[in-house]
UniProtKB/Swiss-Prot annotation:
3-beta-HSD is a bifunctional enzyme, that catalyzes the oxidative conversion of Delta(5)-ene-3-beta-hydroxy steroid, and the oxidative conversion of ketosteroids. The 3-beta-HSD enzymatic system plays a crucial role in the biosynthesis of all classes of hormonal steroids. The lineage of its organism: Viruses, Varidnaviria, Bamfordvirae, Nucleocytoviricota, Pokkesviricetes. It catalyses: a 3beta-hydroxy-Delta(5)-steroid + NAD(+) = a 3-oxo-Delta(5)-steroid + NADH + H(+); a 3-oxo-Delta(5)-steroid = a 3-oxo-Delta(4)-steroid. GO terms for biological process: steroid biosynthetic process. The keyword Ion transport does not apply. Belongs to the 3-beta-HSD family. It comes from the Viruses. NAD(+) binds at residue 159. InterPro entries: 3Beta_OHSteriod_DH/Estase, NAD(P)-bd_dom_sf, NAD(P)_dehydrat-like. It holds the Pfam family 3Beta_HSD. This is 3 beta-hydroxysteroid dehydrogenase/Delta 5-->4-isomerase. Pathway: Lipid metabolism; steroid biosynthesis. The active site is at 155 (proton acceptor). Keywords: Isomerase, Multifunctional enzyme, NAD, Oxidoreductase, Steroidogenesis.
Length: 370
């Protein structure tokens, strides 16, 4: 029976799109889903027209706007809070990142308590843990592995602090006498259809057909398909709705994982770009030189910020992320709430390859005719 009302903040983004689609496909109790975002994309409007069984309500709003948020969460059962600024290139100021990611999260918690929301699932990130600014490796870690999470950059620090705030809110009594159930999910390096990072890499390499990697071949990263991240969110919310404060998820954190291979970041991406005849090359520059360039880029970004937006992909933070092994090996989500990846690695790869081919076809059709 369809009785539940979900709200997904940041629902028009990359991961939000996967969560909305999978909610509609696999959550049999879903009656209504409200997609709360600062913009409403055409794909969502198309989905509203096509979907007759479930009510889809687009809501334009900012998580920093408490009154709009309160209205969007009225009578909601579950909130999946994705909305955040995920910026590693320096496009946004540190103050903006902290304001949206921390104060926005506090507003979401307050609105949940004001409206008597039963379940709040927070989309955190592995960046809340690391890599830290020292570049310390995490090798086959899990949720219980000790790691010195010292952050200097605004994004990972904001996710770390927001995650802490979400977990501390678990069990708080709402205005209507219900205790709020909260958990945090940490996706690893997410890939899949509509991934903005993969699209950026494609567009920057479209003409040259060359991609470059900076890190040693022995530097590995864990990756996870967006559809499986979405599935874990759905299972987590379902378990907390069914079990309330007795759910093992309450006040708990989980890495989002699947069976995707653990490889070098760019070697992994070539599973999708090889089909286009793209070539992956090692940079000839030594690490000390890359660090120098990264710091120069950071300085230029600050100097040029009053007159233009200079956001090179290579900066001290992105260099540390690429050059630091960060791998996770866990089955905590399976043990606690029965999570098994919905999509195999082969299916995940195939879906992503198809989307990349669609990007290629679109780019080719827009080429000026000679």
């Amino acid at each position: 029976m369809r009785t539940l009302v979900y709200v997904v903040t940041g629902g028009c983004g990359f991961l939000g799109r996967h969560i909305i689609n999978n909610l509609i496909l696999f959550e049999s109790s879903l009656k209504e889903v409200r997609v709360y975002d600062i913009r409403i994309d055409q794909w969502l409007l198309d989905l509203v027209e096509k979907c007759n069984i479930i009510k889809i309500v687009p809501v334009i709003g900012d998580v920093r706007n408490k009154s709009t948020l309160d209205e969007a969460l009225r009578s909601a059962d579950v909130v999946i809070h994705i909305a955040s600024i995920n910026d590693v290139a320096g496009k946004f100021t540190n103050d903006s990142i902290m304001d949206v990611n921390i104060n926005g999260t506090k507003n979401v918690v307050d609105s949940c308590l004001y409206n008597g929301v039963r379940v709040l699932v927070y989309t955190s990130s592995y960046s809340a843990v690391g890599p830290n600014f020292l570049g310390d490796a995490m090798i086959r870690g899990n949720e219980n592995t000790y790691y010195q999470s010292n952050h200097k950059e605004a994004y990972p620090l904001s996710k770390q602090l927001s995650e802490k705030y979400i977990l501390e809110a678990n069990g708080t009594m709402s205005n209507i006498g219900l205790r709020l159930c909260t958990c945090a999910l940490r996706p690893l390096g997410v890939f899949g259809e509509y991934c903005p990072v993969l699209e950026t890499l494609y567009r920057r390499s479209y003409k040259s057909r060359k991609m470059y990697k900076y890190a040693d071949d022995k530097v590995f990263h864990s990756r996870v398909y967006a559809g499986n991240v979405a599935w874990m969110h759905i299972l987590a919310a379902r378990n907390m709705i069914e079990n309330g404060q007795h759910s093992p998820l309450c006040n708990n954190v989980y890495y989002c994982y699947d069976t995707s291979p653990t490889e070098h970041y760019h070697d992994f991406n070539m599973h999708f770009f090889n089909q286009l005849g793209m070539d992956l090359r090692n940079t000839c520059l030594p690490l000390w030189c890359l660090r120098f360039i990264a710091n120069i880029n950071k300085g230029l970004r600050v100097l040029l910020s009053p007159i233009c937006s200079y956001t090179p992909l290579l900066n001290p933070y992105t260099l540390i992320k690429e050059c630091t092994t960060f791998t996770i090996e866990t089955d905590k989500a399976f043990k606690d709430f029965g999570y098994v990846p919905l999509y195999t690695w082969e299916e995940s790869r195939s879906k992503t390859q198809l989307w990349i081919r669609e990007l290629e076809a679109k780019s080719s059709s827009q080429k000026p005719k000679s």
